[in-house]
From Swiss-Prot:
Comment on bound cofactor: Binds 1 pyruvoyl group covalently per subunit.
Organism: Acinetobacter baumannii (strain ATCC 17978 / DSM 105126 / CIP 53.77 / LMG 1025 / NCDC KC755 / 5377)
Site positions per UniProt: Cleavage (non-hydrolytic): 249-250
Pfam families hit by this protein: PS_Dcarbxylase
Annotated PANTHER family: PHOSPHATIDYLSERINE DECARBOXYLASE, PHOSPHATIDYLSERINE DECARBOXYLASE PROENZYME, MITOCHONDRIAL
Protein name per Swiss-Prot or TrEMBL: Phosphatidylserine decarboxylase proenzyme
Positions carrying Pyruvic acid (Ser): 250
Listed pathway(s): Phospholipid metabolism; phosphatidylethanolamine biosynthesis; phosphatidylethanolamine from CDP-diacylglycerol: step 2/2
Gene this protein is translated from: psd
Keywords: Cell membrane, Decarboxylase, Lipid biosynthesis, Lipid metabolism, Lyase, Membrane, Phospholipid biosynthesis, Phospholipid metabolism, Pyruvate, Zymogen
Listed GO CC annotations: plasma membrane
Entry PTM: Is synthesized initially as an inactive proenzyme. Formation of the active enzyme involves a self-maturation process in which the active site pyruvoyl group is generated from an internal serine residue via an autocatalytic post-translational modification. Two non-identical subunits are generated from the proenzyme in this reaction, and the pyruvate is formed at the N-terminus of the alpha chain, which is derived from the carboxyl end of the proenzyme.
Residues making up the signal peptide according to the UniProt record: none
Length: 283
């Protein structure tokens, strides 16, 4: 790596700690939620152009018909665009995106990037709720700005708890994954816990800088607070059903207990996935 590239990386990481993360995200959130026709049309057009958004696969193909940027960003897809693997033993991708990391949880640690990991206990935010996942399996899926931003069930189960964990809002990308210790266990997140025929399963929705919000089917849009908030539920969700959505980012992490599933061998860091695609199978 050249001196210039290394310097840019170091400055980017330092800036993460200097920027008022939550205040910036709130400002972006207000713009994203605005239904002002001129503002929302301008923002949608700029975003669509920059990221090459393909509206031909969206349920609503006319960008002007969305009531706000948030409405556009969390757009539904046409029926049949994403097919959920119907094999009863399959574990499917919860979202469109790219695999950041995938594999085993070793000594309670989830691999983040070269030289970086974080504890499953810190990720979940509760030692007792995290216990079943020690030595289990994990997959981290990063949703880029151009991706479909709804998160779906990787396997059928009953939602029993949601746990809002307050935190920071670092940007999520390869640079921060490699240089911010415990990135995913430090950012604000919503932990969704399930009972399944395989035992316990978790889907963790992780926020990031300028993420305007996280929403789940059980809690609605999350209202950030400075404390951990645990809610109990009894909601049955089938594989492929919508679980939640991101307003501007960023990452979904799925966890299973030890010796319950196996990931397909072809998947590795940076593998591209689409929602409903078979990523693994039960044992």
């Amino acid at each position: 790596m050249s001196f210039t590239s290394r310097l840019k990386k170091e400055l980017f990481i330092k800036a993460q700690n200097l920027v008022p993360q939550h205040q910036l995200s709130r400002v972006v959130g207000k713009v994203a939620a605005s239904e002002n026709p001129i503002l929302k049309a301008a923002v949608i057009h700029a975003f669509k152009t920059k990221y090459g958004i393909d509206l031909s696969i969206a349920e609503q193909g006319n960008a002007l018909k969305y009531k706000s940027f948030n409405d556009f960003f969390t757009r539904a897809l046409k029926d049949g665009v994403r097919l959920v693997d119907e094999n009863p033993d399959s574990i499917v991708s919860p979202a469109d995106g790219a695999i950041s990391q995938i594999g085993k949880i070793t000594a309670g640690e989830v691999f983040q990037a070269k030289g970086q990991s974080f504890s499953v206990e810190k990720l979940i935010g509760d030692p007792q709720l995290a216990q079943p996942f020690q030595e289990g399996e994990f997959a981290t899926v990063y949703l880029s700005p151009r991706d479909y931003h709804r998160v779906h069930m990787p396997f059928s189960g009953t939602l029993t708890e949601t746990l809002y964990v307050p935190g920071e809002l670092f940007s999520v990308n390869q640079v921060t994954a490699e240089n911010v210790p415990g990135l995913f266990a430090r950012n604000e997140r919503m932990v969704c816990l399930f009972d399944t025929e395989l035992g316990r399963m978790a889907v963790v929705l992780v926020g990031a800088m300028i993420v305007a919000g996280i929403e789940t089917v059980a809690t609605g849009k999350v209202k950030p607070s400075g404390r951990i908030e645990l809610q109990h539920h009894e909601l049955k969700l089938e594989k492929g059903a919508e679980l939640g959505r991101f307003y501007l980012g960023s990452t979904a992490i799925i966890l299973f207990e030890k010796d319950k599933i196996e990931w397909e061998k072809r998947y590795k860091a940076e593998s591209v996935v689409v929602m409903g695609e078979r990523m693994g199978h039960t044992l």
